[in-house]
């Protein structure tokens, strides 16, 4: 017999926060806050996260949820192949100061903001997915 207050199965939602950030950045015109700090990606990111949270709440959403971000720097893939993403440009200058604000906004949603030096968000998402599935959890990746 199951407890009425407990879900039948844990359901983990993993949000590709890096994907959200870049989509928000390229989707909106440049915006700044009253101090002149770029804020367009922050606005777009939080709007998308708010909509996701609202939709999930209305649908009796996940039992667990986390936002996964890329951490700047090299990854283990660079050690395996020195030219890995060698042609990829750095993030736009006006996006860089928004990263800490986006982390802060994520925490304001009471969501963990997970990032690990040496690993891309995709690698972390894959690891969390494998661990959750091994425990019998359902996993949804939001990208």
Where are these regions (language model features)?
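Noncatalytic, basic helical substrate-engagement surface that gates or grips nucleic-acid strands
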Residues: 2-142
């Amino acid at each position: 017999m199951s407890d009425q207050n407990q879900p039948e199965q844990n359901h983990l939602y993993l949000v590709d926060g890096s994907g959200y950030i870049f989509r928000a950045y390229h989707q909106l015109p440049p915006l700044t806050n009253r101090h002149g700090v770029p804020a367009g990606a922050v606005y777009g990111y939080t709007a998308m996260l708010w909509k996701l949270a609202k939709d999930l709440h209305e649908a009796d959403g996940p039992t667990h949820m986390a936002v996964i971000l890329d951490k700047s720097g090299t990854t283990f893939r660079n050690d395996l192949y020195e030219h890995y993403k060698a042609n990829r440009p750095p993030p736009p200058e006006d996006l860089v100061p928004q990263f800490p604000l986006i982390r802060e906004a994520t925490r304001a949603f009471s969501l963990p903001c997970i990032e690990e030096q040496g690993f891309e968000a995709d690698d972390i998402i894959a690891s969390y997915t494998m661990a959750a599935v091994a425990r019998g959890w359902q996993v949804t990746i939001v990208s």
